[in-house]
């Protein structure tokens, strides 16, 4: 099954967020939230920069999104979500979570599964033209 190219495009934006975190002295984790193939929020890990243990990449992205309905949204995150972030994604009913890397940190895909939120890890092979 071919992976839609838009997933790679949005993951690249999440990677740019991770790079922004690195530039600020933080951890390299980024996220973007989309609806109708448009980015509606972005964020990166701010745990170190703001001395706040809950400001993971996904949480920063959700915070930027504000009090919207998360129905029909897709979260792209560079690293598999932790229990806190997976719980927030489940609570707000994000429709799909696309994960960039799930080997370094396996995360809590079981939480997403329990709440019926599909999670998909992008293949590590290079994007084909």
Task: Go through each PLM region and give its residues.
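General secondary-structure propensity
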Residues: 2-4, 35, 115
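Short, basic/aromatic recognition patches
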Residues: 3-24
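Small-residue (primarily alanine) positions within well-ordered alpha-helices
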Residues: 14, 18-21, 31, 57, ...
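A short, flexible N-terminal coil/short beta segment enriched in small residues
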Residues: 15, 21, 36-43
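Short secondary-structure junction motifs
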Residues: 24-28, 70-72
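Alpha-helix N-cap and coil->helix boundary residues
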Residues: 28-29, 107
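Short beta-strand scaffold segments in enzyme catalytic cores
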Residues: 29-37
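Zn2+-dependent cytidine deaminase-like catalytic core
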Residues: 41-129
């Amino acid at each position: 099954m071919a992976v839609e190219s838009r997933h790679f495009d949005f993951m690249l934006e999440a990677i740019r967020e991770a790079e922004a975190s690195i530039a600020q002295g933080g951890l390299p984790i980024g996220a973007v939230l989309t609806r109708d193939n448009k980015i509606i929020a972005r964020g990166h890990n701010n745990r170190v920069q703001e001395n706040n243990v809950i400001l993971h990449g996904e949480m920063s992205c959700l915070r930027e999104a504000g009090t919207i309905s998360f129905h029909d949204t897709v979260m792209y995150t560079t690293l598999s979500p932790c229990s806190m972030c997976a719980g927030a994604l489940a609570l707000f009913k994000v429709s799909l979570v696309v994960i960039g890397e799930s080997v370094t940190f396996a995360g809590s895909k079981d939480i997403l599964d329990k709440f019926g939120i599909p999670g998909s890890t992008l293949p590590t092979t290079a994007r084909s033209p």
